[in-house]
């Protein structure tokens, strides 16, 4: 095999020798040429699109299942437990999934799937408390950078918190954590907000 001269380098992906003029800062450190970098980026973009489509289809299948789980059920704790189990088992990016319920001036832990969690959260504290204060969904790509984040689990890296409303009043939250950064997007937001509306009668 030909050896690369001082003015050439070897791309680990395509196996071709490249001149120094082809280096980008990133490519130089990884020994990957610009052409291969571009192909990798295109493949990653395509993979993300496919993953988003699969996620949307999964949520689409889950909506009627959630409706079925709560229909005519008097055991509201059991119904919420089943909903959290259904969601948690349906997505690989769900590390923790459960509910926090408004009780006076705190949020109390409800049914969930995942590691042990905080029993109570005050308004304005952490992601859940901030979502309660703002009365809106919060999507946090990196919880380590979120001011006042409550680290119930050291594994959590990103989080989405969705309020459950009764009229204008927030009565509970769907809380989902992931071990990966930037795990949640607009699809998660839109679909979990739909689920929040479906389960709202359980809190009446």
Q: PLM features: what roles do these ranges have?
A:
Residues 18, 40:
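Cys/His-rich microdomains that often coordinate metals
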Residues 67, 178-204:
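Juxtadomain coupling helices with adjacent low-complexity linkers
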Residues 94, 102-154:
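Regulatory sensory and allosteric helical modules in signal-transduction proteins
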Residues 165-178:
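Sensory-domain boundary capping and coupling elements
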Residues 11-14, 33-36:
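Short cysteine-rich clusters marking metal-coordination/redox-active sites
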Residues 158-165:
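A short, aliphatic-rich beta-strand micro-motif
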Residues 53-111, 198-203:
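Intrinsically disordered, low-complexity terminal regulatory regions
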Residues 21-31:
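Short linker/helix segments within small regulatory modules
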């Amino acid at each position: 095999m030909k050896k690369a001269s001082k003015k050439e380098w070897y791309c680990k992906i395509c196996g071709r020798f490249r001149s120094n003029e082809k280096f980008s800062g990133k490519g130089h450190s990884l020994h990957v040429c610009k052409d291969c970098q571009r192909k990798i980026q295109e493949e990653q973009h395509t993979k993300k699109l496919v993953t988003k489509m699969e996620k949307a289809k999964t949520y689409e299948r889950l909506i009627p299942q959630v409706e079925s789980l709560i229909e005519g059920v008097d055991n509201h704790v059991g119904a919420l437990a089943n909903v959290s189990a259904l969601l948690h088992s349906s997505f690989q990016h769900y590390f923790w999934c459960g509910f926090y319920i408004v009780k006076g001036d705190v949020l109390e832990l409800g049914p969930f799937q995942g590691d042990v969690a905080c029993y109570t959260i005050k308004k304005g504290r952490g992601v859940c408390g901030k979502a309660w204060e703002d009365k809106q969904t919060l999507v946090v790509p990196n919880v380590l950078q979120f001011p006042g984040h409550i680290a119930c689990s050291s594994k959590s890296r990103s989080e989405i918190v969705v309020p459950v409303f009764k009229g204008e009043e927030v009565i509970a939250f769907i809380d989902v954590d992931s071990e990966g950064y930037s795990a949640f997007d607009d699809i998660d937001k839109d679909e979990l907000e739909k689920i929040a509306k479906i389960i709202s009668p359980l809190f009446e």
